[in-house]
Amino acid sequence: DLRMSRGLGDVYKRQQLQDSTKVMGGNHAMTGRLTLPTDADIIDETIRLKNLLGADALRDCDGTEMPEELLSEPVKKYATYYTTRKDNEWAMKHPEEIQQEYLISNRITARGETLRIRLMEGFHTEQLKVNTLDDPKRWWEVIDRTTGEVVPTDAWEFDEASGEVEIRTIPYHEYTVSFLAFLIWDPVHMYNFITNDWKDTPHQLTYDVRQPKTRQYVKDKLRKWCEDNPHIDVVRFTTFFHQFTLTFDDKKREKFVEWFGYSASVSPYILEQFEKWAGYKFRPEYIVDQGYHNSMFRVPSKQFLDFIEFQQIEVCALAKELVDIVHSYGKEAMMFLGDHWIGTEPYGKYFAGIGLDAVVGSVGSGVTLRMISDIKGVDYTEGRLLPYFFPDVFCEGGDPIGEARDNWRKARRALLRSPLDRIGYGGYLKLASNWPGFIDEIQNVVTQFREIHENMQGTASYVAPFKVAILNCWGSQRRWMSNQVHHAIWHRETYSAEGVLECLSGMPFEVEFISFDDVRNGIPEEIKVIINVGDAYTAFSGAENWIDEKVLTNIRRFVDQGGGFIGVGEPTAYQYQGRYFQLSDVLGVDREMCFSLSTDKYNEKNDDHFILEDIEGALDFGEGTSRIYAQGGHYQILAMDGEYSQLVVNEYGRGHSVYFAGLPYSPQNCRLLLRAIYYAAGMEQEMKRYYVTNVDTEVTVFQKTGKIAVINNSAQAQHTELYIKGKCAYVLDLKPGEMRWVDDMEDR
């Protein structure tokens, strides 16, 4: 339930909030907790659906309006608020305060002693424009990519008329130019414009709220907006100041998308402040990063981590100023976790200081739900479920009902472990209303969501008596964010690793996210199993951290004394001292890099093991990892691909390890991982305290309310048996996708 918003001091405002809490579902368990979008051309249907679905909040969206006729409805009204766009007049008057992005040119090979590089080749000139206002010699960088050396500024010139940089070169060396460009079309507006085929909508310019004139203007504008919109209860900031990196090519296709990217959070004004704060000179290379733009898969440099820290401090402080303004008018402040979220870092040190009432984000999976629901420092969280009501899904050949079902099945697992306070939808409500059967599907989702809250009554679900830790270079700062390219988007290169977090998002474990510094400082006692998953040399596997003596010895000691270690893909990978997996002794496996082909490996499968006891179907390792072989004297191979291994367990002192060649999300792989974790922890007997026999089903227990949820994660009917304390307590036949509530009989 909604709690007291920050910044509301007088009795009248408190009473307003208490009244709204009742409407939001505090006294009506099977209504409320739902936000619906609306628009000017669907007023009557909005009211009908509000009543049908029990919605207690309405919102506008990008490209829609909140009709005046709905302002008197007895629900909360959300207004989407943009701090960086939708005011072209201001942006055009202050071109120097338009937002900027660091770009890197194509890599061009010199064939003589001079070379001209056209900066905007491959970029869309309606989105980006070279910054010619600030000194290129101060803020740009030309690099010889053959040697890695910076080309002196007196060895190149920018020709503004042609948009080219001319460089004195060494023949057959390769060169790039890193340069600043103005974002003259907001990337999200451009995306929506293209997706919805908006014809007559003006392109929305961006402006940088961090800069002095715009900063004051935006604050004054927000005050006036609050005064002009007394009926709006919740200001839904979408979002604050810096867009994640979303760059289009010259054919209006997405060229570079990094949901965690900081490349568009720069300007000379900001960078001069950073230099004073950091105490050293800024280089464009700290942002463009050889053309990788600090993808989250890259091991972050000290300079990039410094930049993130600085941006958090500044962004969160300025965001607080806007939130304080909203609170002064008796309204709530909600942040959308997406779009211009860069610098807020909800799991960073400064986020709680913003003083937000709520966070809302898009739920594309169990992982992305946990990314929202685990956030602290706000009064409530809200998830915008998929599909978004846009024409790219609600069209001929689209399957919005199937997408809604799949989205809900994944989200529901995570909700039962870490519940959102509210759910909602976005887009054009008319599309959803007109699609046969879709509203019925939404009604089912909303009913199940409310049932979860009704049965849990604000209590936590049962978890195993130990913690599981995900180990990577980002640690707790990027909880539930690892191995992702772009917010819940499937990639062939990542799905075999992403499945680990997706499985964990709905499993009965308390999950911590730890960094290599955490390991160096000593592994916390409550952690019983450490998981390392990812490709070699990425931030998620760990790269050079695996040749740090302290990291290796601390983990070896941890496992030797009874801990568990699970590796997926290329864990602990770094070619050094005759090993590729630096903890091959702990894992019982290594990868053949063709350096040891002369050494014979006598690997044989023996699949008689606790981990495989429930498993009937073929094992799925996704893309897998090739050429894995078992080695040592204490391993057991549970699955093989030809002469190489895919699933291996190993004993190491009093501890255990498990290696998976890959682990994409599936109900069966969730069961595999569940068993692997209990085995690695040496606590197999704990697994059947609460347990269901069918791998397509899962169980969540709320001990304090005496309620148990058994869910069917498949699109088929399933038969399952529920065990409590090792004894069969219920025999259940579940419909496709069903959630069944039963009473906990443990103490009866």
Name each model-derived stretch.
Residues 34-47, 62-65, 335-344, 501-523:
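A short, well-structured beta->alpha microelement
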